[in-house]
């Protein structure tokens, strides 16, 4: 190999390495948040939550949060959704609202299931009785948080260390955010934005909350409780 061939081969290889690294960096930067399919059919929660509400809620509202979040974070350092929430006080209102909306709804769909309802069992049931007195008292307090939230927001059951606490947040905020008044790991949440219930219940939020207990996925809630740090 003569000198010219050596130089061409060496620098060609270096260029390939640099280009490959650049492509990987672009792929990492291009990583985007996605809208997962519902874990059940749109009409699976009937008669408690109607098909059209689920279609609009998932296909329009949740999809918009995902699209807006991707647009707002384009060209920035890739972070997990949880990392974004943990430092949301340093980020724009657009990222705050849409990261919260994406996390909240992704969890919300899994907190419900067809033929749900009933009562929790195991460690979760024991902790609810310990921290609220009984399951019925817990339901009453959670319902008050949901119906008492003025305007749009969420009601939460969260784990703080080894204790369960009920809280509510405005808009798409949640207890994982560093700006939350009450912080903790959500193990159950209820969306009380009007788009979650208005087609079927109009302004009767309390009726929606009462009906929602029939679709709660206590298996999922129990798993989140056990895994919460």
Question: Over which residues does each language-model region extend?
Answer:
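N-terminal secretory signal peptides and thylakoid transit peptides that target proteins
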Residues: 1-14
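Hydrophobic h-region of N-terminal signal peptides that target proteins for export
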Residues: 15-21
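C-terminal segment of N-terminal export signals and the immediately downstream linker at the start
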Residues: 21-48
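Divalent metal-coordination and catalytic microenvironments
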Residues: 35, 62, 102, 157, ...
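Second-shell loop/turn segments in exported
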Residues: 51-55, 92-93
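All-alpha RGS (Regulator of G-protein Signaling) helical domain and cognate RGS-like helical scaffolds
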Residues: 60, 66, 70-79, 85-167
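An amphipathic alpha-helical core segment
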Residues: 144-202, 210-211, 215-216
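N-terminal targeting pre-sequences for secretion and organelle import
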Residues: 207-229
């Amino acid at each position: 190999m003569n000198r010219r061939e050596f130089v061409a081969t060496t620098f060609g290889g270096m260029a390939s390495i640099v280009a490959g690294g650049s492509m990987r960096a672009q792929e990492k930067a291009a990583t985007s948040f996605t809208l997962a399919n519902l874990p059940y059919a749109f009409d699976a929660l009937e008669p408690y939550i109607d098909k059209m509400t689920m279609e609009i809620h998932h296909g329009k509202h949740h999809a918009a949060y995902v699209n807006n979040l991707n647009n707002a974070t384009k060209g920035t350092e890739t972070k997990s959704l949880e990392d974004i929430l943990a430092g949301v006080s340093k980020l724009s209102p657009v990222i705050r609202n849409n990261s919260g909306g994406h996390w909240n709804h992704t969890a919300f769909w899994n907190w419900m299931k067809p033929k749900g309802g009933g009562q929790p069992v195991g460690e979760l049931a024991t902790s609810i009785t310990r921290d609220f007195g009984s399951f019925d008292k817990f339901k009453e307090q959670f319902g008050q948080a949901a119906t008492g939230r003025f305007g749009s927001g969420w009601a939460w059951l969260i784990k703080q260390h080894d204790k369960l606490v009920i809280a509510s947040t405005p808009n798409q905020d949640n207890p994982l955010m560093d700006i939350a008044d009450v912080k903790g790991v959500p193990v159950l949440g209820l969306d009380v934005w009007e788009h979650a219930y208005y087609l079927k219940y109009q302004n009767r939020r309390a009726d929606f909350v009462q009906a929602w207990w029939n679709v709660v996925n206590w298996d999922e809630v129990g798993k989140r409780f056990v895994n919460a740090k």
